[in-house]
From Swiss-Prot:
One Gene Ontology cellular component annotation held by this UniProt entry: cytosol
EC category name: lyase
E.C. code: 4.1.1.31
Name by which UniProt lists this protein: Phosphoenolpyruvate carboxylase
Function: Forms oxaloacetate, a four-carbon dicarboxylic acid source for the tricarboxylic acid cycle.
Protein source organism: Prochlorococcus marinus (strain AS9601)
Superkingdom, natural source: Bacteria
Gene behind the chain: ppc
Reactions accelerated catalytically: oxaloacetate + phosphate = phosphoenolpyruvate + hydrogencarbonate
Record key words, sorted: Carbon dioxide fixation, Lyase, Magnesium
Active site feature: 175, 630
GO molecular function: magnesium ion binding; phosphoenolpyruvate carboxylase activity
Cofactor section: Mg(2+)
Gene3D superfamilies per the UniProt record, alphabetical: Phosphoenolpyruvate/pyruvate domain (1.20.1440.90)
Gene Ontology biological process terms, A to Z: carbon fixation; oxaloacetate metabolic process; tricarboxylic acid cycle
């Protein structure tokens, strides 16, 4: 059996001596094998190493695929439970080490691209009929982008106007939740840092390098002895802690650098263009505020989340301010100080006599240090007050509190707003400037304050539309209206809602006991008002309505907001931005009609916030990728979202309203995921205009934000794509022939997808039996239930996340490609010459290119031989014929789709033009095979035991007790394989 090193050395086309990924992969291989040999029994370690080597060496040697896979199956089926669990853990560890390595290499490549100033590439090779720059698959840096824009004669004024209006918001979510434990993430960070040190080998002595390798191995050995599985179902606050980890460890320090890189790139190409605002790229969060289908997200949880976010920011500011105090040792003996700063010191001396007495002697000639001591005390008092609020809950009224002796002091001296903190820092900055000093640390802290404030990220409230209509229905029942709300037509609802919105008298009685659900719906709005009073409007000003179907869905939320004091009728201003989320294909088609009804209502238009120098009203709209894909398939979902954007932008322009589109993209292709750069470039022209809002799913946070340079790479990628799309107009969206072709492809694809998924009565059983969907639900990874309705087992109740997760685990990846081949084939059957048009679209239309690229990448991860094994082994005998038929339909569609994708792209093999991606996917596809077979083996044994009749514990003999224990261990083994495959595939749902 050849080792990985031997295989690579014997196949020169698979490795480049200069490729850092291949070079360091050998280090990972040696590390993995070394850890197994030290942590596992000798025979077990050798067998696991042999199993992995078998998976790729046989394929490279040209062995029959079926033959070598049978060898793997034989080995897997011969393993006892302990060895199976060890194998699952070993392969999971391997893939996570490879992931860390690839992230490190990506980080290094970004550093090289950023530091490389030789970007003077001619744009002459760009197709003049395609959007300039859009044919570049790889993201460009700011320096390269601005150089090319200059070569394309983009006027400085046009670029500056865009930069000043630019508003990019990345919204962190917990769904799908990260499958890797927080504890493991910390270990991965330490491993990444050690790898980084080892990779600068030219600066290391032999002893230093050996020492680092020893530390690396010990860290991985500790990892091996750590439980990979969550021991309990995480609470919402656990999820909050996980998401905020990236702000604490990476983003707080990385964000100021992003603007700095724009400044440097502008200096080289557009020296007179003004920088965007410090907060041009900012953050939102759904973690702790998204209550759609998650009963654990209560008003109290959202309140505590806001307090926790402020706590983290105050901690960071205290550290930064303390560091500044150490740094700013300027003495009045040798430097002047502004009069404004000196006056502020006198004011602070009166307010903080204890600080003055403690610090005045030490800092008697060091005014900056004294000022920063006062600032530190204000921050600590703000922190003390925040802790009190967090412990007391959102209903607690500080003004009515009389028992706390320290409260008076806290209330009078804490920072009441981030503006007060900014003012103090500006005093220091301006004083330094007045004496010809420029402290970069002060500038950095000010930038951080502008970006994060005290709230860190805005919390979007999300709730499903029927929760509001149900609450209003209960209210109207109590009011005994002549026509009950649920009996009204849509037009009648709109009229009644507008009338009530214009009425100044309250509608909701204060002394009525509502049902628990309605009371909580009302309480959310009350809590939001309290949040805004305490934190300012920035903390929570967007209310997303999932499953929006009609204009009344938005007006209902506005009515409830009015009743809770979030709408000022006198000034006609709303403190809440109501955001409809259009999710299904039918709702996407209906979205322009819904918004047109609302835009015609003067009352509604008057409530929209006015933004920018133009002071135009702004409407935010969210587009859902997950449910539309689950509903109608990949092509139909993407095309209807594309069409909806164009229609909504045209509608907004006609009504002189600015539009901000909120893209609810998931981590996987089947939920709108994929490379952000390509996705943003593929947006219809005129729909961005420098404004975009995008979800960042929990499962991709680590791959984007775990390392500083990775975070900057992702942020620069998103920003350059937004600038590029906004400035380089793409008129091809309006080409009637292309649009008509896409509409036909979408409809045919949708029909074929729905015929299998929604119309085949056996598909649900197929999905439940041949994928680990039921076992996935037992993973303690999310506070949110996998199904929308408790106890429901129908497809409509299953969330899109576990839907995609199950297909990914079993190597079908069906939601990301099924129906594409039939749609393309139908066009070619009508006219074979259409292949030329499809090739033109692939070359010149970013949207179509993005579609084909995503399908190609997904197809490269599909393994129907492994999928067939899931069907044959896990499918029940009584369903064999129907399951065989379903598999045949899937297999036929896969082969058709693959052949046509290759024909359109002009390639011989998938991913042929992307060497790095092909190498990564190829390694994973080969090495993950044993893990799939192992999962099937464990699932089969687990389900066989589960089907046995339960036995009362009072009658358990020794053997039966062992059987019960083994069932638990089998589940554990199965869950470990789910972890491993998720790491190998690099996504869950």
């Amino acid at each position: 059996m050849e080792s990985f090193r031997q295989v690579k050395n014997n196949n020169v086309d698979l490795i480049s001596n200069n490729d850092p990924l291949d070079k360091n992969r050998l280090l990972i291989e040696d590390l993995w094998e070394s850890v197994l040999r030290e942590e596992c029994p000798d025979d077990q370690a050798e067998r696991l190493i042999q199993l992995k080597e078998l998976s790729y060496s046989k394929q490279i040697d040209g062995d029959s695929s079926k033959t070598f896979k049978n060898e793997i199956v034989d080995i897997v089926n011969s393993m006892d439970l302990a060895e199976s669990i060890a194998a699952a853990r070993a392969f999971s560890l391997y893939f996570q080490l490879v992931n860390i390595l690839e992230q490190r290499v990506e980080e290094d490549r970004y550093i090289q691209s950023f530091t490389n100033k030789d970007v003077q590439k001619s744009p002459d090779n760009l197709d003049p009929f395609a959007p300039a720059l859009a044919r570049q698959n790889a993201p460009v840096t700011f320096r390269e982008l601005f150089y090319r824009l200059r070569k394309l004669n983009v006027p400085p004024g046009k670029l500056e106007e865009l930069l000043q209006e630019m508003d990019i918001r990345l919204v962190f979510t917990a769904h799908p939740t990260e499958i890797v434990r927080h504890t493991i993430r910390h270990k991965q960070t330490r491993v990444a840092n050690l790898l980084k040190k080892i990779q600068i080998e030219q600066f290391l002595t032999k002893e230093e390098k050996n020492s680092l390798k020893t530390q690396l191995k010990e860290e991985v050995r500790l990892w091996w002895r750590t439980d990979e599985l969550h021991q309990f179902k995480p609470s919402v606050l656990d999820e909050v802690d996980y998401a905020l980890h990236y702000f604490q460890q990476v983003l707080f320090n990385a964000m100021p650098q992003l603007r700095g890189r724009i400044a440097e790139a502008l200096t080289d190409n557009y020296p007179d263009v003004q920088l965007p605002s410090e907060s041009f790229c900012n953050f939102g969060s759904w973690v702790g505020s998204d209550r759609d289908g998650n009963p654990s997200v209560t008003p109290e949880i959202t309140w505590r989340t806001a307090c926790y976010q402020r706590q983290l920011m105050l901690e960071r500011y205290i550290i930064a301010t303390s560091n500044l105090r150490d740094q700013l040792s300027v003495s009045m003996q040798w430097s002047q100080v502004s009069s404004s700063l000196l006056e502020s010191l006198e004011t602070d001396r009166v307010k903080f006599p204890e600080i003055y007495e403690a610090r005045a002697t030490r800092y008697r000639s060091e005014p900056y240090r004294l000022k920063l001591s006062y600032i530190l005390e204000k921050l600590r008092l703000t922190q003390e007050r925040n802790n009190l609020l967090a412990d007391s809950g959102w209903k607690f009224d500080l003004e009515g509190e009389t028992d706390n002796k320290n409260l008076d002091k806290v209330e009078s001296l804490y920072y009441k707003s981030v503006k007060e903190f900014t003012y103090d820092l500006e005093l220091i900055k301006n004083s330094l400037i007045s004496t010809d000093l420029n402290c970069e640390s002060v500038n950095t802290l000010l930038t951080q304050v502008h970006i994060f404030g005290f709230s860190l990220a805005s919390l979007d409230i999300r709730q499903e539309s029927t929760r509001h209509s149900d609450a209003i229905q209960e209210l109207t029942n109590y009011l005994d209206l002549s026509v009950q709300y649920d009996q009204m037509s849509e037009e009648e609802k709109i009229k009644w809602l507008i009338d009530e919105l214009n009425t100044k008298r309250p509608l909701i009685p204060s002394d009525v006991h509502w049902t628990k659900t309605t009371e909580e719906t009302f309480s959310v709005f009350k809590m939001v008002k309290r949040l805004q009073q305490e934190f300012g409007s920035r903390i929570c000003h967007s209310y997303v309505i999932s499953m929006s179907h009609s204009a009344s869905d938005l007006l209902e939320v506005l009515l409830l907001a009015k009743e809770m004091g979030l709408l000022d009728q006198n000034s006609q201003k709303s403190k809440l931005l109501v955001v409809p989320l259009f999710e299904t294909v039918e709702d996407l088609k209906r979205a322009p009609e819904v918004m047109e009804k609302l835009f015609k209502l003067d009352f509604y238009r008057s409530l929209l916030p006015k933004v920018g120098e133009s002071f135009k009203p702004l409407q935010e709209l969210m587009l859902g990728y997950s449910d539309s894909n689950k509903d109608s398939g990949f092509v139909s979902s993407n095309w209807e979202i594309h069409r909806a954007q164009i229609a909504l932008q045209n509608l907004s322009s006609r009504n002189n309203i600015l539009l901000r589109l909120f893209h609810g993209r998931g981590g996987s292709v089947g939920r709108g995921g994929g490379p952000a750069y390509q996705a943003i470039l593929a947006q219809p022209s005129g729909t961005l205009k420098g404004r975009i809002k995008i979800t960042e799913q929990g499962e991709v946070l680590a791959s984007k934000y775990s390392l500083p340079e990775l975070a900057l790479y992702n942020l620069e990628t998103v920003t350059t794509a937004v600038i590029q799309n906004s400035l380089v107009n793409n008129r091809l969206d309006a080409t009637p022939e292309w649009n008509q072709l896409m509409s036909r492809l979408a409809e045919t694809s949708r029909s074929h997808y729905r015929k299998l998924v929604h119309e085949n009565p056996d598909l649900l059983n197929f999905f439940q039996e041949v994928t680990p969907i039921e076992e996935i639900s037992k993973l303690q990874i999310s506070s949110r239930p996998a199904r929308r309705k408790k106890g429901a087992k129908d497809l409509s109740s299953l969330r899109a996340i576990p839907w995609v997760f199950g297909w990914t685990q079993s190597r079908f990846l069906l939601p990301s490609w099924f129906g594409v081949g039939t749609a393309l084939s139908s066009e070619l059957n009508l006219d074979p010459q259409q292949i030329e048009l499809l090739r033109v679209l692939h070359q010149r239309w970013p949207f179509f290119r993005m579609l084909i690229s995503k399908v190609e990448m997904t197809l490269s991860k599909v393994d129907l031989e492994v999928a067939r094994y899931y069907v044959d082994t896990l499918g029940s005998k009584e369903n064999k014929d129907s399951f065989d038929n379903i598999f045949e339909v899937i297999s036929k569609e896969y082969n058709l789709t693959k052949s046509l994708i290759l024909e359109i792209t002009g390639k011989n093999k998938l991913l042929e033009s992307d060497r790095d991606l092909k190498s990564s996917v190829s390694l994973r596809n080969k090495t993950i095979i044993p893990l799939g077979f192992l999962q099937v083996s464990l699932l089969r044994r687990l389900r066989d035991q589960t089907r046995q009749p339960p036995i009362s514990e009072f009658f358990l003999d020794k053997d039966e007790s062992t059987r019960a224990y083994s069932r638990s261990e089998l589940l554990r083994g199965a869950l470990l394989t789910i972890n491993g495959i998720a790491a190998g595939m690099r996504n869950t749902g």
